[in-house]
Structures are given as structure tokens and as C-alpha cells.
Amino acid sequence: MSWRYLCGMMGAEKGDLIMSENQDTKKVLLLALSGFELLEFSAFAEVLGWAKLEGGLAVEYDTAGFAREVRSTFDVPVTVDRVLWRRGAGVCSPVSVCAEDYDALAIPGGFEEYGYYEEAYRPDTAGLIRAFHKAGKPIASICVGALALGSSGILEGKKATTYALSGGHRQKQLAEFGAEVLTDEPIVVDGNLITSCGPSTAAGVAFQLLEMLTDRESAERVKKLMGFTPDH
């Protein structure tokens, strides 16, 4: 299945939503690493999809992975829009994925048993993350997606968090990457970097990213449209 704009299809009446012609479109690269968590992936897709379709906001996303079909946690196959260029492939081409073409990067977490860290720790992945960070663009991760950020080196000296259960060993790993781990915060924002402590934070992270791309009022409006209470 393709996740491109399948979300938020509750259906506004034709003509209900009109985007401003001078509204710059914000584009997010939604990364689907092998073994990614569907819940976390879909939170980004849903919130951005609702923001565009029901909220009338100029936001959209491309999904990307190291293969056209990516197996998520529990072996659910997902077809992505773009295939990540591999190290040594040279400069970006029309079929490559370049940070300069996007305004933000979203990284769901995943399971080790389904090969998540094999791709999360790839030099290609680290290079992509560093490119977004160098450009000052928002990077939002959920749960162990923060470990991909840590592996890239961008969390050194930054406040962050990651999966908090199972004895906190993932948080210890994050600390080894030089992050200042906040163990009592479900979502941590340090500048343009968003990290979180588990799958339950997925929607909150997605709304935080939407706020960074637009504004608080717009994010709260989409949250209300989706039926979330002000505290969730």
C-alpha cells in the first residue's frame, strides 16, 4: 500500500477549504527504515494529511526508504514514494532524496528484531540526518528513532530522550551518543530537534512538528479537527 495522502479522508465538502495562493508549501520527508513502527509512521502521515486536507494548510510529505517496498514491524509491507540514494552514488539526481528539497525530516522508531538498527545506523542515514541538521531544518523522531539521530552525532550536548522502558537501556545508549537524556519528559524539544520516549507520544510529536512548520494556532486547530483534547 502507498501512504501518500491516504490520511484524513473524512471529507470536507468541496470548496470548504481554500489554501492561500501565497502560502509556501512545507514539505516533510517521512523516513521508513526497515522494521519501522506503523503506529509512529502513521501518526506523521495522519497529522500532516489532516493538516492539508481538513486544515487547509500548505503541508505535504514524501515517504522514503532504502527499497521501494519496506517491511515494517510485524512484516506489514509499505510502498514508499522515494528510494534513498546510496553512499557513493554521487550528487543528487531526480530520483535521489536530498535534504534541500524538504523542510523537515520525520523518523519513526522501530524494532531491532525486524532490522531497524541495520538501517538506522547506516552511514547513508546519518548523512541525511546531518544534512537536515546543518540546514537548520526540524527533525522529529519518535521512540528509538532518536538513536538514529544520536548515531549521526547531532545529539551531542543536546537534550533528548528515547524509549524509556525495558530497564532504560535505550536511554543509556542515547547517553553514550553524548545526549543529555531527560528521563522524566515524554517529548523533548531542543531547538529544531524533537525526540520522545515511546509509541504513545506519536501524535504529540507529529503535532509538535506541524507547529514548527506552521504555527501553534494552526497545529491546535488541526488537533481539534482530529478530536484531540487540548492536553493530548
Residue ranges, per PLM feature:
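Short, thiol/selenol-centered motifs that function as redox-active sites or metal-ligating centers
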Residues: I142-C143
